[in-house]
């Protein structure tokens, strides 16, 4: 059995490569790691489960499937954390930020996003939909600008993935209802 080629956005040179990349990303990272991680972070933040939040951060850090996306995810997560500065009176956020500054946590985007949803009392389905839209839009529009892909082809791809979000979100939420409070992400 041959080993799977690493998932790298840099290898995308045409629209078909982009389709293939997005299909793999959806299957290997987005649906089984990122969406469940946002949901778990939301759950942990709602319940004040700080140790579990740090454990989730460590598991994301150790996940080989996320390594090629770590720079971007950490950058976005830390930027989001900085934008939440006016909310540092929130104990969970304050503690997590301190751990990121001290190097005890990395500050992955799905975790910061989940905490953000919890602090702002955003309903989880709505929040996961927002996370998904931002993720797909970031990938597709970012590569479109870099590679000069046609707007119409990229818009079609974006619509395709955004239209699929409700099903994936429902899978995450329904699965979590069967065993509340447990980590849902399938780390690889």
Regions found by a protein language model. Give the residues of each.
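A contiguous pocket-lining binding segment that forms or flanks enzyme active sites
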Residues: 98-150
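C-terminal auxiliary extensions adjacent to catalytic cores
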Residues: 131-188
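Inter-helical turn/loop segments and adjacent helix faces that build the functional surface
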Residues: 8-16, 87, 91-95, 119-127, ...
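Glycine/small-residue-rich interface belts in oligomeric ring/scaffold proteins
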Residues: 1-50
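Internal, conserved structured core segments that host functional sites
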Residues: 35-43, 47-120
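Hydrophobic alpha-helix position signal
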Residues: 2-8, 84, 117, 143-144
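Electropositive phosphate-/nucleotide-binding environments in soluble metabolic enzymes
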Residues: 12, 16, 32, 67-70, ...
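Short secondary-structure junctions and interdomain/linker hinges
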Residues: 29-33, 45, 67, 87, ...
